[in-house]
């Protein structure tokens, strides 16, 4: 009798915990969608990019030595047939996604996408992928469309060093597995 009661209490606690986890996941997903919408509005209204230049949730095929996988990002801005910047939105710590955006920008094209940004809507880090440096810490420091067009004029497609390519692909692939939303949409 005591064992049955303990088992019933354990199952009830499990149910409560699972409901709480699901609720928190739904809140995080809603926050992420809010960040993505805010970034889209910023790109269009403040930065003056055209909607047709911004790819939303694009997927890229990644060929590793032993498998092939699809990886994605929130936004890619393409100018003059060149992927100019990748943008990853986060509902929590942007630091945890810095490595992903850098690896992603280095490996999804046959050249390094020159810029990457990760943001939670408040904070941001903007990276120059070729030099490896941080060039901005706010979404407001992101290039406006005309500045981006000026930068792309002299852009030379530089592939990532082949001896480091597999490692970067594996980093992008590993992050892809952990970024899936936990809540079914």
Tell where the protein language model's regions lie, with residue ranges.
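A short, conserved, highly charged catalytic patch centered on acidic carboxylates
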Residues: 2-114, 130-185
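Short beta-alpha junction loops
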Residues: 119-124
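Conserved blade-register residue in beta-propeller folds
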Residues: 126-128
């Amino acid at each position: 009798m005591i064992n049955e009661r303990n088992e019933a209490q354990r199952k009830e606690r499990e149910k409560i915990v699972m409901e709480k986890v699901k609720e928190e996941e739904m809140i995080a997903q809603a926050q992420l969608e809010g960040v993505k919408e805010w970034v889209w509005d910023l790109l269009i209204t403040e930065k003056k990019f055209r909607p047709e230049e911004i790819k939303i949730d694009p997927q890229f095929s990644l060929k590793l030595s032993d498998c092939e996988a699809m990886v994605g990002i929130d936004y890619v801005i393409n100018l003059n047939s060149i992927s100019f910047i990748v943008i990853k939105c986060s509902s929590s710590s942007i630091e945890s996604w810095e490595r992903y955006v850098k690896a992603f920008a280095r490996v999804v094209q046959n050249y390094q996408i020159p810029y990457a940004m990760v943001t939670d809507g408040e904070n941001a880090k903007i990276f120059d992928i070729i030099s490896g440096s941080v060039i901005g810490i706010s979404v407001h420091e992101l290039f406006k469309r005309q500045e981006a067009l000026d930068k792309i004029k002299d852009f030379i497609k530089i592939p990532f060093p082949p001896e480091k390519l597999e490692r970067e692909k594996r980093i992008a692939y590993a992050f892809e597995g952990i970024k899936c939303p936990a809540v079914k949409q």
